[in-house]
């Protein structure tokens, strides 16, 4: 091996003179200039051999045997040697430049001994075995063994097998020197390089940089020597000159002398930060087969130097040039001495275009200087933390209050909806609405007149509150008086004008809340107004009249004012004197006070009303107590009779009785189910304390407790309905009868859903069954069987004798025989729908019955 050391090229910038030779003419870079002591170009040649071939160039090799002295454009050019290095390890080790580059890589990796040992073994094997070389061969074998194998910490010793090391040691100890004694060790080291170091070298930056620059890598120039590259050096360029400095010939002499330790193309220390952005670029590596090519184009280390004959253009110019090349497919890389006009012949067109696109992407990211814009206030204006916190807390509290109000309103509306939904099934619940704040017009005459004033004042105070309090009072009043009649057909809250007129014309205000009042309602209002005036007339002028005379006259006038046209009743309105003498108990005025505010207003107005009274208060006697007890007992007995009558005939829930021509409202039996034929001559109110003001009212229940109880009962009813079909029919019957009741516009809203007893329901079912049996002439011991055959929309219906039908009997009904699957409908609470189709497979199994029928589906088995 003839390897000569190569020094670092001289920097022409340090000793530049006017007599220095000019740069070579484009196309003549490969010519050897004998007068210049320094080489005109620096590159590794691809020649194989030991001698120096300085007159050739790997970029454009000069061939003297051609007519023009070089290859014309369009002619074929040999594959560059650095691409052959990727074929195999032997191709790499057969080239001197490849060996030098590979050794540089191994030095960086700390395993250069592998390559040295491989060449040492090759040289030892080439020594001729003769007597004169015997001693030399022994010394060389011992030197190789001591340097590479004896040291167990060395890379070669670690990669060599123990048996191989023992064999080599035995040969040296016995002095049996054989040319092939290191062949096994060389083979093992070569295998190690092929598996590890050689693939790593092909993927290393040093090899990729070498291929990118066209075999002109600065790293190779500065780190190693090559026999084929001696005598060559990089062309001298002026040193890097800053923008604000002036170049001098003798500047930085010491720095230039010390640049042997660094590549000539490396940036000075002071320019590292200035050129950081252009030097940072990402390199992607591609491999196609055995060929390894470089990734996206990267700017050279020093942007002020010309690299491989290509001058760098500004960023905008480079972008425009690349875009023009991609758009027009023009050739913008033209050189005077190139085989294919600047495009390497070993690249296919597709790869070249892809590389150009990658270059455009990289050049498009050139950092631009900051351009100051017009100053404007930023969007996020800084605010003082304390002021910002106060503003934020204020807004959040407003949002929280809004949400809480919405939640409360929704909760109350939900309660009202629950009451409305439970109105059909719960006889104790009354219809919701603002009209529940006052009892019906005729019922007011059973209160003392001061209670009338108190009720109006309480209503006025209640309507002056916010809507939430109105809604609360409405819910509480509905729960406390579930059976009370609504004041009128209107469901709109009275405005201030209506409220102001209430004490004057109570009957009209009580029944005339809506804009459009029917004629019957007008009659009722007029009657109520007339009767109201009659009461006040007795207040001021007839306090000294006897009680019996007052009662008789009040009864007579109440008959004329009663809008339902019933017979005269015995519990009509009474004079103020009698009302106060009978109903002066402390709890009498509290009967109307359903809420706290109304109660306070009642007490306040009661004191005002008592100031100008001249009537004497009397304590009720024994006859009045007996009369009261008799009324209570009679009311209870009549209620029981009415319930038994409902069970026998169902008259109270049928709603089929036609009213008389002069009746403008629903029958009394529908409004008050407990009112029997004997009691239809008297108006029986819903509560006992209205019948007799001396009776204390019931304690007001807790609304939340009532709601919880209603919800619990509804849940229990749903559970029982899902478990027992009879219970479900019970609830459905109740809801149906509640909806079937006719509600004319002029009549009060129904308070109580007519009761449906189990006995009545069973009687209804029995009658329906008898009716069906009589219509179809179905025998009692037969059952209807209906089935859908193979997805047909219309079922088949037939009669089967017996109540228990098995699957075998059902199969005999089918006209088509085959393999089928049978499903039958049955009641089940397993799913929400309440029914399922159950498959039956055994012929002896009894088919389920659904609503007195057997309903089945026959599906064909595929």
UniProtKB/Swiss-Prot annotation:
Compositionally biased region (Pro residues): 429-441
Positions of region (Disordered): 1-78, 215-289, 316-344, 413-441, 480-500, 531-629, 641-679
Biased composition (Basic and acidic residues): 545-556
Region (Interaction with PPP2CA), start-end ranges: 575-789
Location of the region described as Interaction with GSK3B in the Swiss-Prot/TrEMBL record: 348-433
Subcellular location: Cytoplasm; Nucleus; Membrane; Cell membrane
Interaction with CTNNB1 as annotated region, ranges: 434-502
Motif (Tankyrase-binding motif): 20-29
The keyword Phosphoprotein belongs to this UniProt entry's keyword annotation: yes
InterPro entries listed in its UniProt record: Axin-like, Axin_b-cat-bd, Axin_TNKS-bd, DIX, DIX_dom_sf, RGS, RGS_sf, RGS_subdom1/3
Processing and modification events after translation: Phosphorylation and dephosphorylation of AXIN1 regulates assembly and function of the beta-catenin complex. Phosphorylated by CK1 and GSK3B. Dephosphorylated by PPP1CA and PPP2CA. Phosphorylation by CK1 enhances binding of GSK3B to AXIN1. ADP-ribosylated by tankyrase TNKS and TNKS2. Poly-ADP-ribosylated protein is recognized by RNF146, followed by ubiquitination at 'Lys-48' and subsequent activation of the Wnt signaling pathway.
Domain of life: Eukaryota
Modified residues (Phosphoserine): 75, 77, 217, 469, 486, 493, 511, 581
A cellular-component GO term for this protein: cytosol
Entry note about domains: The tankyrase-binding motif (also named TBD) is required for interaction with tankyrase TNKS and TNKS2.
Quaternary structure, from the entry: Homodimer. Interacts with ZBED3; the interaction is direct, enhanced by protein kinase GSK3B and casein kinase CSNK1E activities and decreases GSK3B-induced beta-catenin serine and threonine phosphorylations. Component of the beta-catenin destruction complex, containing at least, CTNNB1, an axin and GSK3B, that regulates CTNNB1 protein levels through phosphorylation and ubiquitination. Interacts with CTNNB1 (via the armadillo repeats 2-7). Interacts with GSK3B; the interaction hyperphosphorylates CTNNB1 leading to its ubiquitination and destruction. Component of the AXIN1-HIPK2-TP53 complex.
Name of the molecule in the record: Axin-1
Organism: Homo sapiens
Species lineage: Eukaryota, Metazoa, Chordata, Craniata, Vertebrata
């Amino acid at each position: 091996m003839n390897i000569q050391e190569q020094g670092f090229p001289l920097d022409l910038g340090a000793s530049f003179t006017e007599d220095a030779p000019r740069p070579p003419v484009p196309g003549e870079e490969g010519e050897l200039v004998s007068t210049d002591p320094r080489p005109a170009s620096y590159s590794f040649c691809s020649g194989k051999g030991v001698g120096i071939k300085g007159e050739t160039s790997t970029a454009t090799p000069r061939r003297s045997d051609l007519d023009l002295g070089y290859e014309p454009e369009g002619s074929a050019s040999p594959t560059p040697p650095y691409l052959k290095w990727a074929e195999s390890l032997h191709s790499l080790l057969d080239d001197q430049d490849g060996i030098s580059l590979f050794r540089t890589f191994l030095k960086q990796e700390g395993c250069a001994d592998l390559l040295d040992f491989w060449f040492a073994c090759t040289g030892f094997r080439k020594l001729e075995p003769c007597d004169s070389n015997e001693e030399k061969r022994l010394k060389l074998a011992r030197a190789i063994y001591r340097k590479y194998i004896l040291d167990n910490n060395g890379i070669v010793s670690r990669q060599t097998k123990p048996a191989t090391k023992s064999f080599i040691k035995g040969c040296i100890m016995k002095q049996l020197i054989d040319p092939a004694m290191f062949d096994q060790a060389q083979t093992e080291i070569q295998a190690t390089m092929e598996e590890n170091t050689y693939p790593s070298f092909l993927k290393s930056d040093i090899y990729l940089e070498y291929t990118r620059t066209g075999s002109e890598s600065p790293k190779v120039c500065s780190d190693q020597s090559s026999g084929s590259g001696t005598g060559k050096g990089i062309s001298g360029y002026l040193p890097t000159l800053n923008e604000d400095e002036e170049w001098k010939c003798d500047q930085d002499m010491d720095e230039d002398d010390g640049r042997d330790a660094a590549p000539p193309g490396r940036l000075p220390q002071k320019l590292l930060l200035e050129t950081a952005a252009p030097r940072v670029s990402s390199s992607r590596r591609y491999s196609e087969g055995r060929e390894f090519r470089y990734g996206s184009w990267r700017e050279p280390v020093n942007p002020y130097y010309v690299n491989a004959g290509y001058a760098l253009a500004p960023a905008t110019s480079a972008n425009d040039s690349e875009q023009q090349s991609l758009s027009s497919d023009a050739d913008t890389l033209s050189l005077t001495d190139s085989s294919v006009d600047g495009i390497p012949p070993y690249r296919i067109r597709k790869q070249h275009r892809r590389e150009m696109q990658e270059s455009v992407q990289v050049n498009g990211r050139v950092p631009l200087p900051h351009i100051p814009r017009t100053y404007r206030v930023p969007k996020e204006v800084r605010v003082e933390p304390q002021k910002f916190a106060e503003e934020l807390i204020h807004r959040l509290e407003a949002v929280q209050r809004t949400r809480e109000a919405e939640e409360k309103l929704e909760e109350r509306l939900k309660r009202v909806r629950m009451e409305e939904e439970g109105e059909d099934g719960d006889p104790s619940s009354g219809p919701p609405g603002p009209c529940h704040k006052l009892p019906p017009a005729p019922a007011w005459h059973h209160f003392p007149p001061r209670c009338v004033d108190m009720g109006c004042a309480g209503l006025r105070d209640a309507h002056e509150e916010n809507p939430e309090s109105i809604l609360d009072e409405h819910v509480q009043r509905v729960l406390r008086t579930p059976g009370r009649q609504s004041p009128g057909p209107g469901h709109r809250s009275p405005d201030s004008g209506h409220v102001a007129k209430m004490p004057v014309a109570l009957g009209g205000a009580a029944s005339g809340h809506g804009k459009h009042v029917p004629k019957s309602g007008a009659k009722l209002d007029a009657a109520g107004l007339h009767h109201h005036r009659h009461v006040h007339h007795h207040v001021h002028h007839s306090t000294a009249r006897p009680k019996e005379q007052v009662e008789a006259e009040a009864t007579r006038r109440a008959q004329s004012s009663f809008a339902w046209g019933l017979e005269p009743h015995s519990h009509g309105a009474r004079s103020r004197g009698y009302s106060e003498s009978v109903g002066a108990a402390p709890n009498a005025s509290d009967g109307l006070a359903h809420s706290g505010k109304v109660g306070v207003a009642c007490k306040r107005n009661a004191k005002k009303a008592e100031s100008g009274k001249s009537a004497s208060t009397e304590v009720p006697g024994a006859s009045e107590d007996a009369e009261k007890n008799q009324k209570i007992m009679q009311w209870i007995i009549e209620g029981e009779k009415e319930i038994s009558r409902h069970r026998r005939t169902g008259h109270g829930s049928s709603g089929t009785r036609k009213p008389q021509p002069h009746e403008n409202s629903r029958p009394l039996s529908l409004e008050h189910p407990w009112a029997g034929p004997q009691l239809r001559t008297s108006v029986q109110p819903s509560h006992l304390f209205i019948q007799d003001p001396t009776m204390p009212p019931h304690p007001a229940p807790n609304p939340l407790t009532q709601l919880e109880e209603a919800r619990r009962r509804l849940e229990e009813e749903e559970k029982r309905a899902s478990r027992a079909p009879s219970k479900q029919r019970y609830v459905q019957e109740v809801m149906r009868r509640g909806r079937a009741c006719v509600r004319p516009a002029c009549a009060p809203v129904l308070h109580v859903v007519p009761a449906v007893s189990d006995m009545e329901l069973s009687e209804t079912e029995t009658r329906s069954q008898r009716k069906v049996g009589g219509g179809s002439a179905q025998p009692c011991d037969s059952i209807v069987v209906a089935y859908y055959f193979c997805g047909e929309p219309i079922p088949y219906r037939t009669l089967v004798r017996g109540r228990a039908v098995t699957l075998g009997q059902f199969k005999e009904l089918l006209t088509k025989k085959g393999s089928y699957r049978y499903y039958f409908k049955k009641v089940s609470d397993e799913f929400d729908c309440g029914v399922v189709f159950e498959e039956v497979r055994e012929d002896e199994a009894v088919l389920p019955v659904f609503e007195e029928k057997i309903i089945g589906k026959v599906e064909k088995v595929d």
